[in-house]
């Protein structure tokens, strides 16, 4: 089975503030989500994973790519066409 992934570019530079804002929006607007422990890479990059009934949501604060972005198996209309 192929799972569609929605990608949302939030910030063109890595940013703890933008990363925290995205996580806050997801946590406040999504119902019945489970937050996993945050993953931190050796370069300081962070990944926050959320589980929902419809699929996973992954929020990245990626210092190697230098961006904040979301890859999600769930369509997140709150991020379509806008950035934080």
Annotated model-derived regions:
Residues 8-11, 48-52, 70:
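Short beta-strand element of the conserved SAM-dependent methyltransferase core
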Residues 1-3, 14, 45, 58, ...:
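Alpha-helical structural elements
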Residues 40-60:
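Short, intrinsically disordered low-complexity segments
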Residues 1-39:
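Negatively charged, low-complexity tracts enriched in Asp/Glu with abundant Ser/Thr
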Residues 25-27, 36, 43, 50, ...:
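General N-terminal targeting signals
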């Amino acid at each position: 089975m192929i799972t569609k992934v929605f990608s949302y570019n939030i910030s063109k530079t890595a940013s703890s503030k933008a990363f925290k804002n995205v996580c806050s929006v997801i946590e406040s607007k999504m119902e019945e989500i489970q937050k996993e422990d945050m993953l931190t890479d050796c370069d300081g990059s962070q990944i926050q994973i959320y589980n929902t009934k419809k699929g996973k949501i992954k929020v990245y604060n990626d210092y190697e790519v230098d961006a904040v972005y979301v890859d999600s198996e769930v369509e997140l209309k709150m991020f379509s066409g806008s950035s934080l």
